From Swiss-Prot:
Pathway: Amino-acid biosynthesis; L-lysine biosynthesis via DAP pathway; (S)-tetrahydrodipicolinate from L-aspartate: step 4/4. Catalyzes the conversion of 4-hydroxy-tetrahydrodipicolinate (HTPA) to tetrahydrodipicolinate. Belongs to the DapB family. One of its GO terms (biological process) is lysine biosynthetic process via diaminopimelate. It is found in: Cytoplasm. It holds the Pfam family DapB_N. GO terms for molecular function: 4-hydroxy-tetrahydrodipicolinate reductase; NAD binding; NADP binding; oxidoreductase activity, acting on CH or CH2 groups, NAD or NADP as acceptor. This is 4-hydroxy-tetrahydrodipicolinate reductase. Signal peptide: none annotated. It comes from Wolbachia pipientis wMel. InterPro entries: DapB_C, DapB_N, DapB_N_CS, DHDPR_bac, NAD(P)-bd_dom_sf. The gene is dapB.
Length: 261
């Protein structure tokens, strides 16, 4: 029996990619697709989006959670909060890649239902996180750490969720407090010893570039990841949904792509 997957935010760039990945994955089938209330596609077949499958676009988040085995969300903080409440109500596992969610206590909801959240669903970025963690453990606090990221000119959150996750990974591995040691470059102040610096660029249609640098007076170690196509995020999200349903559907908890790979 195939896993029934619901998609929240089906008209967005990521939503469309995820729908396309779902129709090519033999383990899953599309349970339903949600768009924002007021969209001209509500009650229309998702055919114009991907393919004629006899599935209509809806604005009912609760309805999708009730009819799905697992739900994937790539939307906004406000919509994600509605998804979290619906996930708890219907005990439906949730996979989310929504960023800019400061102040949301995922652990509170994960105590009642399986939730997998990652700032970046790309397998490559999650390998980068493992490499960065190992580098930080080996190098300790003797190297300055700089994280640079670039995204398209419409991205709202800054630094990106992935950049912040990289910073937190380094802080944990180096045994320092992330909140008190992070800073975004501005003004003319000298960099803080042991600080984790962030630099941000926005322009054009860049999907996502991330670079982590460990620098001292003698050398620089640089680890990079560049996303070529958003398909990498969609494929990772579907992989995460399958993993969450097959392995943790009855085990509430907060999971990430680090668990999947």
């Amino acid at each position: 029996m195939k896993i029934r997957v619901g998609v929240i935010g089906c008209l967005g760039r990521m939503g469309k990619k995820i729908l396309n990945e779902l129709i090519t994955n033999t383990k899953v089938e599309i349970a339903g697709a949600v768009a924002r209330s007021g969209s001209k596609y509500i009650d229309s077949d998702i055919g114009p989006i991907i393919a004629n499958l006899g599935i209509k676009v809806t604005s009912s988040i609760s309805g999708i959670f009730e009819s799905s085995d697992v739900v994937i969300d790539f939307t906004t903080k406000e919509c994600m909060l509605d998804c979290l409440k619906a996930a708890v109500k219907f005990k439906t596992p949730l996979v989310s890649g929504t960023t800019g969610i400061e102040g949301v206590d995922l652990k509170e909801y994960a105590a009642e239902v399986p939730i997998l959240w990652s700032a970046n669903m790309s397998v490559g970025v999650n390998v980068l996180l493992k490499l960065v963690k190992k580098a930080a453990e080996l190098l300790g606090n003797e190297y300055d750490v700089e994280i640079w990221e670039m995204h398209h000119n419409l991205k709202k959150d800054s630094p990106s969720g992935t950049a912040i996750e990289l910073g937190k990974t380094i802080a944990n591995a180096s045994k320092v407090d992330f909140q008190s040691n992070q800073y975004l470059h501005s003004g003319s102040n000298i960099r803080k010893k042991g600080g984790i610096g962030f630099a941000v660029s926005r322009g054009g249609g860049v999907i996502g570039d991330h670079s982590v640098m460990f620098v001292n007076s003698d050398e620089r170690i640089e680890l990079n990841h560049k996303a070529i196509d958003r398909t990498t995020f969609a494929r990772g999200a579907v992989q995460a949904a399958v993993w969450l349903y097959e392995n943790k559907r009855e085990i509430p908890g907060l999971y990430s792509m680090q668990d999947v790979i």
